[in-house]
């Protein structure tokens, strides 16, 4: 029979844990509102910016004279994977889903004889990938001291990536992140950013504009900003996804703690009842002996 004192201590311990998970759920809910607003506010700008770039790119075509960020290096031998995860855990499968997608992509490329390099953003992704892919690591971006992600953070990451591209360190760059859909749904996403790959259709009005000095010159100026914009959008999507996943995980943890408290309380009451029954039997047996 379980010790009553041990059961009582376990109940108090689970109650204490439930208070913590409930508090974390409430904090995540408050942060989620801000993060979701930021992610949703960035989407129209990002989509429009990409549409303009896509229109310009369509005008340039596959000309070899186009910017390298658009036409590429002429090879796809070396791939840079920018894996964006959280600095903290306790957010369900948020980090593992991104790491799983990046790992599968890296293994596929290696099987094809490609060279893979990995730049991690966020501690948790680095921890999950280092066991199998540490030899491919070339850098890490620490955002643990950043309370709210800004465009400057994205611009710094973009500058690092672009610097490596200009130095000839890779041919293709892909970012990995979670796209926010809802509190209970975040979609692991792989998005190529170099050479430029635009989502959606090109700007339908692009052919109505005359560009000076030329489409190539304008693209050469806008494409680096496009890389930073896509990275910033990914960081915002990741931020909203992280808080949504943490809120959901802490809600589940709080519910599970409540269920455990209920089970332990029933077990405690049954054990206490058994102790009282045994004591009564002993008293009655003693009285009969007299």
Swiss-Prot record:
The gene behind this protein is atpG
Q: Which NCBIfam families match?
A: ATPsyn_F1gamma (TIGR01146), PRK05621.1-4 (NF004146)
What keywords tag this UniProt record? Answer: ATP synthesis, Cell inner membrane, Cell membrane, CF(1), Hydrogen ion transport, Ion transport, Membrane, Transport
Pfam families membership: ATP-synt
One Gene Ontology term from the biological process aspect of the record: proton motive force-driven plasma membrane ATP synthesis
Entries under PROSITE patterns matching the protein: ATPASE_GAMMA (PS00153)
**HAMAP family per UniProt:** ATP_synth_gamma_bact (MF_00815)
Where in or outside the cell it occurs: the entry states: Cell inner membrane
Name listed for the protein in its UniProt record: ATP synthase gamma chain
Q: What is its main location?
A: membrane
SUPFAM superfamilies from the UniProt entry: ATP synthase (F1-ATPase), gamma subunit
Q: Which GO terms describe its cellular component?
A: plasma membrane; proton-transporting ATP synthase complex
Query: How would you describe this protein's topology in the membrane?
Result: Peripheral membrane protein
Q: PANTHER family, per this entry?
A: ATP SYNTHASE GAMMA CHAIN, ATP SYNTHASE SUBUNIT GAMMA, MITOCHONDRIAL
Q: Where is the signal peptide?
A: none
The text of the family note is: Belongs to the ATPase gamma chain family.
Identify a single GO molecular function assigned to this protein.
proton-transporting ATP synthase activity, rotational mechanism
Report quaternary structure and partners: F-type ATPases have 2 components, CF(1) - the catalytic core - and CF(0) - the membrane proton channel. CF(1) has five subunits: alpha(3), beta(3), gamma(1), delta(1), epsilon(1). CF(0) has three main subunits: a, b and c.
Keyword Cell membrane, does the record have it?
yes
Report the function annotation for this chain: Produces ATP from ADP in the presence of a proton gradient across the membrane. The gamma chain is believed to be important in regulating ATPase activity and the flow of protons through the CF(0) complex.
């Amino acid at each position: 029979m379980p010790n009553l004192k041990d059961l009582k201590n376990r109940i108090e311990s689970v109650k204490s844990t439930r208070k913590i998970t409930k508090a974390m759920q409430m904090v995540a809910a408050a942060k989620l509102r801000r993060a979701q607003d930021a992610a949703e506010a960035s989407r129209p700008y990002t989509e429009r910016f990409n549409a303009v770039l896509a229109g310009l790119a369509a005008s340039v075509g596959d000309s070899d004279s186009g910017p390298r960020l658009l036409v590429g290096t002429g090879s796809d031998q070396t791939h840079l994977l920018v894996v964006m995860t959280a600095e903290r855990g306790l957010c369900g499968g948020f980090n593992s889903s991104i790491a799983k997608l990046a790992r599968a992509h890296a293994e596929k490329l290696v099987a094809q004889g490609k060279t893979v390099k990995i730049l991690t953003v966020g501690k948790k992704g680095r921890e999950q990938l280092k066991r199998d892919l540490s030899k491919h690591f070339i850098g890490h971006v620490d955002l643990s001291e950043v309370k709210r992600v800004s465009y400057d953070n994205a611009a710094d990451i973009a500058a690092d990536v672009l610097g490596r591209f200009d130095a000839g360190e890779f041919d293709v760059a892909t970012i990995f992140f979670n796209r926010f859909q809802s509190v209970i749904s975040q979609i692991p996403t792989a998005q190529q950013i170099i050479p430029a790959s635009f989502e959606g259709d090109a700007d339908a009005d692009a052919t109505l504009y005359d560009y000076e000095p030329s489409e190539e010159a304008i693209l050469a100026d806008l494409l680096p900003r496009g890389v930073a914009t896509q990275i910033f959008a990914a960081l915002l999507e990741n931020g909203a996804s992280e808080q949504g996943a943490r809120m959901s995980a802490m809600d589940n943890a709080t519910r599970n703690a409540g269920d455990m408290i209920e089970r332990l309380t029933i077990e405690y009451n049954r054990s206490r009842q058994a102790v009282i029954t045994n004591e009564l039997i002993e008293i009655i047996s003693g009285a009969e002996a007299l």
